[in-house]
Amino acid sequence: MQRKMANNDVMTRNFSTIKADAHLKEAYDAIKKNLEGPPHAPGLVVLDNAGKYAGVLTVDDFMKELARLYRAACDQLGKKEWIAAFFNQCELIGIKKVSEVMSGKRLSIREGDDFEKSCKLILKKKLNLLAVVNENAEPVGIITRRKVLEEIAPRIFT
């Protein structure tokens, strides 16, 4: 009988972190670097001041914030130049804190749990990134949608 895979069998151990009180400008730079090179992750693991897991910040979180600003700019009555209002608001994003925009607050999975459980959570919640934590709530890895696809696709298509 084949042993079930655990999260620590498939998780990516090379991942980037950022403090919850960091500014989004710093987070954007880190995410951009992540996307361009290893670990090629769509986000960052967010840490509280004690170094414990606090959440994740993903490209989707940035896009949701931009969409919110876009709607606010378009809704301003009497504004013919919504684009100017939009970019004025965008300049303020950089000073926001990561904790104001991050998602996945406290949503994580344990390193010894079945990978199948992670797959279900990622697929059900439509997550891009799931943090893997140890018994002390310290992040030890990540599982991405891409990793789920890499692990499941061969079973489906071979």
Regions found by a protein language model. Name each.
Residues 13:
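Extracellular/periplasmic ligand-binding regions of membrane signal-transduction receptors
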Residues 79-94:
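Glycine/small-residue-rich phosphate/adenosyl-binding loop
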Residues 61-78, 148-158:
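A short, polar/charged loop-to-alpha-helix boundary motif
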